Amino acid sequence: MTTIYVVDAFTTKPNTGNRAGVVLDADHLTTQEMQDIAAFAGYSETAFVLSPKDQSHDIHVRYFTPTHEVPICGHATIATHFLRATTGHQSDYPLIAKTGAGHLPVSIFGSSKELLVKMTQGRVEFLSPFNESQRTELASALGVSESDFADLPIQVVTTGHSKVMVPMLSRNKLDELI
């Protein structure tokens, strides 16, 4: 039987923050089984903890959305190491976590009541800003006007898992997108 833990990252209050699924012992699972579990769990990402395959890392973590595997997930990484530290599955920090985005250092600070998990992400990379045609297409896809965008570049930024950064003029317009 596989246990899926539900962990709220970036918060000290239950049922707030950014929720992730975490499976602490995934060595027996196939890639398809991990994908099926992530789809069943339904969280934006579910992390699967695997034993290290060599001495280049202390832990191997794979991340799945309900539809596909992704190289890294910040909040699921924080959730995974918080859970491991508070359930006795890991006490030796810092450590090196192998992910699809590379080998990342993870540290734990504080006491059991107020743990702080620190992960060092990969080097940030900024891709070319969107051109006018791409900005128009994005505004249409989001259901907003181009005038809702701040006068800053819209571009893909990555530290291992690419995201489109869309600066909005208004917090209200941003909230309407959710």
Identify what each model region corresponds to.
Residues M1-I72, I78-I178:
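Active-site proximal loop and beta-alpha junction motif in alpha/beta enzyme cores
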